[in-house]
Amino acid sequence: MNFCDNNEMNETKNFMMSNKNDDIVVDCDEYIDGNVFEKNTNMGNIYDENYNVDMKNDNLLSKLNDNISFTYTTNGQVEKQENEIKEKQNILHYQIYIDNDEDKYKYCSNSNLHKNEEEHEKGSPNNIYEELDNNLEKKYFYYNSDSKHCIDEKNETNDLENENVVTSMDVSYENVLNDNFIKSRSTSINYTDNSFVLNKENLKSSHHINGYYINDHDNIKSDIINDHDNIKSDIINDYDNIKGDKINEYDNIKSDKINDYDNIKSDIINDYDNIKSDKINDYDNIKSDKINDYDNIKSDKINDYDNIKSDKINDYDNIKSDKINHYDNIKSDKINDYDNIKSDKINDYDNIKSDKINDYDNIKYNDDSQINNNVSNKVNSPDDDPNTYEKDKKDIINCNIYEENKNNMNNIIHNDKENIHMVDTGKNEENNNIDNKNNDDINKVNVLTRVDTENYILNEENILPLHTNDDVTKLLDEINDLKNTIENMKKEKINLLSKFKAYTLNNKKELEELKIKCKNKEEQIKMYENKLQNKEDEIMNYVNEIQNKDKKIESYHIKLHNKEEEIMNYVNEIQNKEEEIIKYVNELQNSDVQKEKKELKTINEVLKNTNEKLEKEITSLLGEMKKIEEENKVLKIFKEEKNKINNEKVTQIKGDDINDDNDMKFKQILLDNKTFNKLLVNELNIVEENILFCFSIDKDKNRLLVCIKQNDDNFFVIPNCIFDEKFPGLQKKTESMIIQDIHEKEILELKNKQMNELYILKKEKEDIYKEYEEYKKKVTSLINETNYNYKNIEEKENEIKELNNTLNKYKEEMNNYKEEIIVINEKYKLLEIELCKEKNIRDQQNVGISDLKKKMLKEKIELEKKYKEQYEKETQQKINDMKIIFDNKEKILQDQIDDLLHKIEKLTFSNDEKTKTIENLQIYMDNDDNIMNQEGIQKNEKKQIIDNPINTDEKDLLNYIPDNHINSDLNHINSNVENDYVEKRNKNNVHLSKKETNYQHNINEQENDNNNNNNNNNNNNNVEKLKSINSTNTSIPIYPYEYKKIRKKLETYEILLNEQQEGKKKMTEEINSLKNQVKNYESINGNYQHIIYQKNILSNFIAQIPSRIQVDDYVSVIFNSFNFSNQEIEAINIKRSKK
């Protein structure tokens, strides 16, 4: 079975099994709609069964495009002991195997069934099948590229009365959640279930077939039917063996006449075999051509075949009934003579036959009642008919043919169990072969009956004149040939119509496939565009981060400049202090020594205090410097980490696509495999305590997976929808159990902590700046104090040296900061280069996408043109071929009709000739009245009864022996008729050969139209001829009954020709309608593409309008008029917000 993308298929299968006594009809309906698979089987005359299989799965059947195989096998052993059937073992094996590019699914089940034998109230054997010991094994196997699932289940029931059921299950998962920490998992369950009980009342629901009760299992029914057929075949073989002995005795009696009959029959059969071999070769050649298109036209051909078969069977029955009645009337006279001669021998034969048949009836079963009725009818029928032997022989042949066909079908079914597609084709071929064989047998019977009538007519040479019978037989043969040609024309017409339908279906399918491919490619392009947009957004985020970092670097530069300015201020202040110190030194040199000593003491004391204070302040400044250095180190580390993160993000962009695909596949596996999850959930017992946690798959958190614990060792993951269906009473604490919510809460807490820490750091920085300002104030105050107290130069020089050292350190740090800034600038330039490269790559991708779109459009246009041209050419060729074929066949039929009209005109004669023949008859009858005896009169009456279609007056004409002059006239007339007929036949043959040579050259439409006009003119001429014949009363036909038949057949031929012309007109109308549909489709496609082009222009124009400008009233009209989707509107609004 092939599942198309439309996910809709309805297929019906009809099988017919025929037996000597009854017929069995089997209907099999298969229907698929969406995700439901239904299979219905009905068998008439045995039992009625409705077997429904519902496979409800989200996306399982919609993905099955490659292969599906259902296998159903039964294994049984049958023994025959004392006319009873004992079934030792019956195994039911059911297997479903689904294979696809993405998914594979396999289901196997085995069960053993045993039989319980009881006795009926009346004592008749009653076979009731019960599942007393049921060993059931199931295997599930499902895997795809990401995960594998295997389940082995065993169900053993030993005692139905104790109601104990023991089941065991082994489950194994590999890479189920597609996580790093969960690679495989296996569980095993062993439990007993007392609720699973098989009631005997339910098990005894059975169907009655010929005295047997059979349980509702297909395998048991099929085995019993096969056994029944085998028994029937054995009985028929025994009957044939008994009958053979009788037939040998009867053959010795009838050897004289049968030898003649066999010689005639052998010649006919040889001719029939030669014709059959030619037809089989032609059939095989045609079959090889048709097998390729068989799958596409299967449903149409089956329906056509059934209709044709029903029509043929009805025609065959009507023809056969007429021929059989005619044959029986002809043979009735011979049979009476034959019975008078051999009555004694037949009576002996009847006595022997009755004894043997009584023994045979004691052997038969109750099931073969119909066979007994047939045999009894044959025994009780009067043996006066010598035709009993031939009827029995035909029945035997039909039985053998049925058995051979049945054996062939069974062999083919056993050989083709594995491939269901080959089985279907094989069955259809066998059905066709069976129909051909049945048709061949029917033709054999027709040939035999026709030969018997001809032999009977040839044996009556002394009574009927030869020349009249020859004309009649030739006319009959020609009529049969015309019938065959008409039937062949019908068949060819049906075949051509089916081929034309198949061709149109193939073209439609190819166009649909191309459309689907184009849609898939457009969706892929949209996916790539979305990915590019996401990457552009990520790049914009990176650019914003880099800009923020640039701003931070500029702020650090500003801080450094401020620090440099402060240092320069300190240097200027120190220089000013030095100058002041020099002034103090000069003043001291001019002052007195005493003053100096006193002042030195005071200065020393002050300097000690100041030195202590300065030492404390210097230590505090050194601590602050260390803090600043630590902050610089932290900033360096932060920058390095940010650079690493940026590089990792660039590398992760490529890996995210692969992980996203794997995640999507895994999600689809977990959500799509509902049947697998349902099988697990049906066997679980869950309490609210066993629910561990939930895991959301969608962003909106609508689709959840529930993790369940059972027996502390087994864990299961089930979709939320299946959990709610199977356990509606249980409540899930979704707010506290969803893992994503927990992690999101933790992330929020961490973010809050980080924000608090940043806030604290900012406060600390502000406090440090405040302290620094206070420190500045203190330093100024101290400097003012030192201006009055610095008098010791040596100490001040040491301080100056220390300050110079500190300055050198600051300069070194400044150089280091400058080097770091240079490195950061280089990295920034590299990032800019990478951004430029990515932009170039994006531009190249956009160019490539635009080129792909253009190529797609070109390919679409080219493919549509190609297929249109091919379709128009092929349709025109086929139409021309059809017209030529029908025109040529019409010409042939018209020629044959003209021949028949010519013959009918020659078979008639005028009223003058009729009056002459009547006078001669009166004279002849007056002379011969005294000579005729009573026996002769009786014989003539019998012979007149045999000749059904000939009237009494015309019979006298045929029995009359005319004078020599009249005989010469008649012979002359007959010879002229024969010569005309031969000349006409030769002309027709020559004409046909010329037509066959000119078929290939005359293909133009003008010539076909001329042929049609000529055919119409010929038909009108034929009608006028017939009217003229009807209007004139001068000619009277010799054989009015046959003349009426021929006239009716000619009228039917004219009706058929008119019907064929009407069929041609209908064909042309259908072709024109198909062309109009193609044109409409092209116009619709062009309008759709134009609308999409306008839509893209409007969307780009609206996206360029910034969000500040309010244009909602105008834009909403455009959105509603062009049917913009919500996603497209959101994308346009995003672009507007950016601008």
Curated annotation (Swiss-Prot):
Residues 369-380 have a biased composition (Polar residues). Residues 1084-1135 form the GRIP domain. Keywords: Coiled coil, Merozoite. Possible candidate for an effective malaria vaccine as determined by epitope response in sera. Residues 1009-1022 have a biased composition (Low complexity). Residues 366-388, 1004-1024 are annotated as: Disordered. Residues 472-648, 758-877, 1043-1084 form a coiled coil. The keyword Iron-sulfur does not apply. PANTHER family: GRIP AND COILED-COIL DOMAIN-CONTAINING PROTEIN PFC0235W, SWI_SNF GLOBAL TRANSCRIPTION ACTIVATOR COMPLEX SUBUNIT SNF59. This is GRIP and coiled-coil domain-containing protein. It comes from Plasmodium falciparum (isolate 3D7).
